[in-house]
Amino acid sequence: MSFLKSFPPPGPAEGLLRQQPDTEAVLNGKGLGTGTLYIAESRLSWLDGSGLGFSLEYPTISLHALSRDRSDCLGEHLYVMVNAKFEEESKEPVADEEEEDSDDDVEPITEFRFVPSDKSALEAMFTAMCECQALHPDPEDEDSDDYDGEEYDVEAHEQGQGDIPTFYTYEEGLSHLTAEGQATLERLEGMLSQSVSSQYNMAGVRTEDSIRDYEDGMEVDTTPTVAGQFEDADVDH
């Protein structure tokens, strides 16, 4: 596979926590062979007997877990999901550019499974993975905790450099209006009153009951409808 490279295994300088020999690596269901798994603080690496292998950066690892499914042909193993693309180098050209573009919109996911010959080592492998992963938090998770809204600077206010937002009740707001503002408010209220009361002029008839209902809080007018006025209307039940 094209992504397999030759590199020195991580050592104590990289914070090596666990070295597990005789561990089979499986990529998306395809076996890569048996080698040694290195769980270090800097990266997760696997090398086969010939010195070829791969390394995974922790920020790209979205999930790691222990699989206890004994019905799986691999048996118990360490499962690792990576948000990156690892595959054999394809020799076939892409037939459709549109199909290639659609693949770019989907985040690539690769599944690795590490199967040690010594199943009792799985717990220690998982614990080491947890410790190393905690050293590399997801930057997106940190950004989501940031508040994008405008914040009130308490310290600046204590130093006399900030303003406290002012809130008024309805009555307090009226007292802060200028004479011109009060006149404008009265004019708007009058227009609103005329607009609402005009809704009670059915067929050109305005009754005292409709005015009283409006003044009492917009009650429903139960006055019988003039016979024949809406007989031709279609009603959906």
Curated annotation (Swiss-Prot):
Its main location: cytoplasm. It holds the Pfam family Voldacs. GO terms for molecular function: RNA binding. It is found in: Cytoplasm, Cytosol; Nucleus; Cytoplasm, Cytoskeleton. Residues 139-153 have a biased composition (Acidic residues). GO terms for biological process: cell volume homeostasis; chloride transport; mRNA cis splicing, via spliceosome; positive regulation of mRNA splicing, via spliceosome; spliceosomal snRNP assembly. Coiled coil: none annotated. GO terms for cellular component: cilium; cytoskeleton; cytosol; intracellular membrane-bounded organelle; methylosome; nucleoplasm; nucleus; pICln-Sm protein complex. Involved in both the assembly of spliceosomal snRNPs and the methylation of Sm proteins. Chaperone that regulates the assembly of spliceosomal U1, U2, U4 and U5 small nuclear ribonucleoproteins (snRNPs), the building blocks of the spliceosome, and thereby plays an important role in the splicing of cellular pre-mRNAs. Most spliceosomal snRNPs contain a common set of Sm proteins SNRPB, SNRPD1, SNRPD2, SNRPD3, SNRPE, SNRPF and SNRPG that assemble in a heptameric protein ring on the Sm site of the small nuclear RNA to form the core snRNP (Sm core). Residues 135-159 are annotated as: Disordered. The modification N-acetylserine is found at S2. The modification Phosphothreonine is found at T223. It comes from the Eukaryota. The modification Phosphoserine is found at S102, S144, S193, S195, S198, S210. It comes from Homo sapiens (Human). Component of the methylosome, a 20S complex containing at least PRMT5/SKB1, WDR77/MEP50 and CLNS1A/pICln. May mediate SNRPD1 and SNRPD3 methylation. Forms a 6S pICln-Sm complex composed of CLNS1A/pICln, SNRPD1, SNRPD2, SNRPE, SNRPF and SNRPG; ring-like structure where CLNS1A/pICln mimics additional Sm proteins and which is unable to assemble into the core snRNP. Interacts with LSM10 and LSM11. This is Methylosome subunit pICln. The gene is CLNS1A. Belongs to the pICln (TC 1.A.47) family. Keywords: Acetylation, Cytoplasm, Cytoskeleton, mRNA processing, mRNA splicing, Nucleus, Phosphoprotein.
